[in-house]
Design a protein with these regions (language model features):
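PP2C/PPM-type serine/threonine phosphatase catalytic domain
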Residues: 1-274
Length: 274
């Protein structure tokens, strides 16, 4: 496998809640999520949840090729739950969660799964890149975040509005009409976006956390083809550098309203050789 991986926490000394890893023919990326300052009922934390779930999903998808990625994810969610339900109260609304992107190469096709607002970029040899993104969280967020976007990022007023927004968002997590994300309940895996693509049609596959897609979907400074070109020339490190440069130019979120001035950013770029 020809894979390049780059990941950077939101703050240099901060904990990175993203997780990405590869095994022969399989790649996964997870972006841990929680509600800042809220009681979670879990003593382990978001980074533990995303990395533990990611590691289990990688091993399950590798060891059980006959099971679909959605089935592998459900199995992995149940396994993580069994690891800490005896010591943690998983009934809390703000229990740790994570987005999930997973791909697995078979003999002729690439199977994929996307759950939550991380993205999968499929580069077709003849048609260019196609992004697979679960828009349900974004759609729900747009209905709720108006007061947040009107305030300077990092201000006390913004922090208060953001807390209210996140509380409202949590109430719609893993519910019909809301959005779906990996958490304590395995049935969320049934709601993932899934599909297959002929391997011979693809030149590369890229897994991206939403902190790494900001140039496209938040800032509007690049297209998906341009993002693919950056990955091809400078790799994930250059893509993340450009994201950080844009964030630094708008620290208070006046130009690009957002919940956090900086976010964990991860990109896994897998070049599929002909």
């Amino acid at each position: 496998m020809n894979v390049v991986l780059g990941s950077q926490p939101a703050e240099p000394a901060g904990e990175n809640e993203d997780f990405a890893a590869v095994a022969p023919g399989v790649a996964v990326l997870l972006d841990g999520a929680g509600v800042a300052g809220a009681e979670t009922g879990c003593t382990h934390g978001i980074a533990w949840f995303s990395s533990t779930l990611g590691g289990l999903l990688l091993s399950t998808a590798t060891a059980q090729p006959a099971r679909s990625l959605a089935e592998c994810l459900a199995d992995s969610i149940r396994a993580v739950r069994s690891l800490h339900e005896g010591s943690c109260d998983l009934t809390y609304r703000a229990s740790p969660t994570s987005t999930v992107v997973a791909v697995r190469a078979g003999a002729e096709a690439l199977e994929y799964l996307v759950l939550g607002d991380s993205s999968l970029l499929l580069a077709d040899r003849g048609m260019g890149p196609t992004a697979v993104t679960d828009r349900r969280l974004d759609d729900v967020g747009k209905r709720l975040r108006g007061p947040v976007d009107a305030l300077p990022t990092g201000s006390p007023e913004h922090a208060a509005a953001l807390a209210e927004y996140r509380d409202a968002l949590t109430g719609l997590r893993n519910k019909p009409g809301g959005f779906w994300i990996a958490g304590p309940e395995a049935d969320a895996a049934e709601h993932a976006l899934t599909g297959t693509v002929p391997l011979e049609a693809l030149s590369s596959v890229t897994l991206l956390s939403d902190g790494a897609t900001r140039l496209v979907d938040r800032f509007g400074l690049a297209t998906w083809p341009e993002t693919l070109a950056v990955l091809g020339s400078g790799g994930p490190v250059e893509l993340i550098r450009r994201v950080r440069e844009a964030e630094a130019g708008d620290p208070d979120g006046r130009r690009w309203p957002r919940g956090k001035a900086h976010d964990d950013a991860t990109a896994l770029h897998w070049l599929l050789l002909p």
